[in-house]
Amino acid sequence: MTELKNDRYLRALLRQPVDVTPVWMMRQAGRYLPEYKATRAQAGDFMSLCKNAELACEVTLQPLRRYPLDAAILFSDILTIPDAMGLGLYFEAGEGPRFTAPVTCKGDVDKLPIPDPEDELGYVMNAVRTIRRELKGEVPLIGFSGSPWTLATYMVEGGSSKAFTVIKKMMYADPQALHLLLDKLAKSVTLYLNAQIKAGAQSVMIFDTWGGVLTGRDYQQFSLYYMHKIVDGLLRENDGRRVPVTLFTKGGGQWLEAMAETGCDALGLDWTTDIADARRRVGHKVALQGNMDPSMLYAPPARIEDEVATILAGFGQGEGHVFNLGHGIHQDVPPEHAGAFVEAVHRLSAQYHN
């Protein structure tokens, strides 16, 4: 494979020296970019875009043409695994993702296959290989998956949810069925991420978007336990280089110590966690990624710069920080504000690296 020209993102995840703090944005390939909207229209719909390696590659690269980002992230969706399990994924206008055949009981769980990543999910691996080829070693490529708990919420609720009553009913009334589902998902995610690594992903991230809706005890049992199993099963080296793993639980700021015990290399933070506090608590064990409120990108560039400066000062001197938003970029953010954000991170962070 081509030698990496810019590896500061990988170095920061391993708490190694860098010249400036690396930066990328969750959902950096997305609807805030007019060129993304044009490519998506060309694809016809969202899943057709995900399943076409050339177009998925095109949208992955679009933000890198605009901004000097330090990493590319595979353009895909967290629901590829449940889709490959045969749940009938579709997107309802204004409603988000839905499943025609949600999981309602242990009998449904028993019938679910564990997808072969090079077969049912081969389109994702094709996209990874295509993106790596087209990146020409400019920056590393991040692969990702949803966490078992987060995937299970969609599969059991039948789509997005606000209160999570359906999955919580299963969790409290039939925990055995839910554990069986989570175990199957943990095996599937491990295979899926390892296949992405073999196809060329240089770092992987597990998105636990809905872990924060759980009590501390339930988080440990139903979310973190299964992410830990995945981390234990991942390929940690490929192409002669360490493959860093980042865990991100939205709303998980109170559980950072337990998350850092999983053996991951980095933790993602949302904007409700104070980064200085997070570094005091776990900075000796893991790198930290985050954590500007994505809504800050609606502010004028001077205010964005002020927020970047505050977060950099909060993390302080030294290594182990990847700058990011605390969750995905909103679809109506002005693209030039995203540009001001990226530029400010690089310009203002050099003083923190000797």
From Swiss-Prot:
Primary localisation category: cytoplasm
Pathway: Porphyrin-containing compound metabolism; protoporphyrin-IX biosynthesis; coproporphyrinogen-III from 5-aminolevulinate: step 4/4
Record's subcellular location: Cytoplasm
Top EC class, one word: lyase
Binding site for substrate: R27, Q28, A29, G30, R31, D77, Y154, T209, H327
Enzyme Commission number(s) of this protein: 4.1.1.37
Catalytic activity: uroporphyrinogen III + 4 H(+) = coproporphyrinogen III + 4 CO2
CDD domains cross-referenced by the UniProt entry: URO-D
Keyword Methyltransferase: no
Site for Transition state stabilizer, residues: D77
Family matches, as PROSITE patterns: UROD_1 (PS00906), UROD_2 (PS00907)
Gene Ontology biological process: protoporphyrinogen IX biosynthetic process from glutamate
One Pfam assignment: URO-D
Keywords annotated in UniProt: Cytoplasm, Decarboxylase, Lyase, Porphyrin biosynthesis
One example GO MF annotation: uroporphyrinogen decarboxylase activity
Entry GO CC: cytosol
Subunit: Homodimer.
Family assignment from sequence similarity: Belongs to the uroporphyrinogen decarboxylase family.
Function: Catalyzes the decarboxylation of four acetate groups of uroporphyrinogen-III to yield coproporphyrinogen-III.
Name of the protein described by the UniProt record: Uroporphyrinogen decarboxylase
Source organism per UniProt: Salmonella heidelberg (strain SL476)
Lineage of producing organism: Bacteria, Pseudomonadati, Pseudomonadota, Gammaproteobacteria, Enterobacterales
